[in-house]
Every structure is written in structure tokens, then in C-alpha cells.
Amino acid sequence: MLKKKEEQTTGKNIGKNMCKIEQKLQRKHLIALSFFLPLLVMAGCCIVFGVQPFGDNSLLIIDGLHQYMPFYSVLYDKLKGGETLFYSFRSGLGINFLSLFSYYLSSPFNLLILFFKKSQLNMAVSMIIVLKIACSGMTAGIYFSSKSKKQGFSTVMISMAYALSSYMVGYCWNVMWLDAIMIFPIVVMGLERLIDKKDGKLYCLALFYALYCNYYIAFMICIFAIIWYIFYSFKSVKQFFFRGISFALYSFLAAGMAAVLLIPAYLGIKQTASGEAMTLPDHSFLTNAADLLNRQFAMGRPISHDNFDGNANLYIGIFTVLAVG
């Protein structure tokens, strides 16, 4: 009898372990698809529209061509020649290059330009954009697959919707913003882990990466994190306040680690004309609800990047609107 019970127990344990292994494999496959499908979509778009290396066009427009590319050219020379990142004599009598680096060029993805010739920088940056979009799908897949035990292709579809959103299409030429968008799902995942499991390491590292790569978008992520924390479902008031202390400490720790670039960036901004009078701007609505709703329909125009009206690229699709309704 004892042997039979032991055999049954062993069989159940093996069955449970096999289920766990299958779930892990399935999750890995979904995450991989969340990376490769946006990558294939972007590669297809590059082929159709003749973006380098499949033609002479570029994913960069406006400031991307006239401002960012010269910055990448200087960075390329500095990395290849072993020059300092603190200063550059390429502009006038010289400029504080570190403050410029902290906003435009601090992404680790930019090291990939070293694998290209200087004449291929435009192609290199376009490929970096495609890679960041694909990685955004992957990080979204990691987050969404962690939210449910039942893994399905819907996880991949939602991740693709995030990676190929209207925001990405409209602003992908602002290549320095994409790192923060890419790491955003991990920031949220880390924040939830901090609240539920008292483990703030992932949140701290993810927020540090966002602050290090681009403080502009990271500032918006910080605002979102505060709002997300306030409206999160806590078990008790005690948990809300005690986790709040941890939330604040890990947030300050992330900012402290990123201070190596945040402080030079702040000092650099203070020396500019816009930094002399740092006051809150006037607020006004740039669009109306009817126009925003109209953008959600098929055959509409959800993307606005050929003018400077300041309208936000907010597109979630009519199916989402109907689901919310």
C-alpha cells in the first residue's frame, strides 16, 4: 500500500513538473513570437518602402536627418577614435557633449553603429529603430505573459499592438525615445512585483535604464508609476503605506544610479536660453474628443507627423473602443 501511494505521489509530482516545463516553453515561444513578428513586419515595411539596406530611403525624418545624424557622426568618431565624451570641438568653440549625450545618444543600442562604416550610419540607425521596436514587442510579451497562467496567441497580438502602435509609427524617428518605451512594460512588471512580493530589484533596474537612456520619456514613466501605484489593488491600508516607502526608496535609488547622466544634463539645460526661466507653460487642449474618436476608425488618419500642430498620436483601434463601451 505504501509503495502504491509513493508511486502515485511520484506520478503526480512528475505530471506537475511536466506541466510547469510545458508552460515555461510555451511562454518562451510566445515571447519569441512577440519579438520576431514585429521584426518581420518592420522588415517587410522597409522592403516595401525601400528603406536602407533595401533602398535609399530612411526611417529618419525632420530632426532625425538634420540633427540626430550629425550627433551620431560625432559619436561614431569618438567611439572609434577613443575620444572623450565630455566635450566636443565640432560646434563653434566647443560644446558640452556629455549633456547632449545624456539626451540623444546614451542608449546601449547605439554601440551597434561600430559594426558599420561611417557612410552607413543612416542605415545603422534605421536598423536600430527596427530592433528597438522588436524589443518593445518582446518586453510587452514578457509582461503580458506574466499576467495570466493561460498562455495564448492573444498575448502575442497584444504585444504586437504595443510594439507597432500609432505612437511608435509616428515617433520612431525620435530614436532616443524608444528605449524608455521598450523598457516601460518591465517597469510596470517590476512595480507590481515590488507591491506583491516585496522585491523591488527589477523595478529599480528597469527605471534606472529608462532614466539613463532618456530622462524626457522616463519622467513621464515616473508620473505613470505614481498613478499606477495609487490605483493599484492593495490588500490593506498598511500595505499601501509600507510598500509606498519601498516604492519611494527604490525610485530614488534608480535616480541616484542614473545621476551620472542626469546631473550633467540638468546643468547643461540650466546654461541654455530655455533653462534661464524654468516656469510651467500655459495649458490648452490641442484636439477635441470628436477628432480623437474619428482617428480610431478604419480608413482614418491616426498618425500625425507631417506638421507641427502638437497633436498626440493616440490610436487604440475601434475594437478597443467598442470593448470599453
Name these PLM-found stretches.
Residues 4-5, 16-19, 23-25, 147-150, ...:
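Membrane-interface junctions at the ends of membrane-embedded or membrane-associated helices
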Residues 22-35, 53-59, 212-249, 293-319:
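Alpha-helical transmembrane segments and their immediate interhelical/interface regions
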Residues 27, 31, 118-128, 187, ...:
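Membrane-interface helix-boundary signature
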Residues 38-42, 130-143, 152-234, 247-266, ...:
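Membrane-embedded helix bundles of polyisoprenyl
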Residues 48-148, 153-185, 209-213, 301-307:
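Active-site lumenal/periplasmic loops and adjacent helix-entry segments of GT-C-fold
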Residues 62, 66-77, 94, 102, ...:
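Periplasmic/ER-lumenal interhelical loops and adjacent helix-loop junctions
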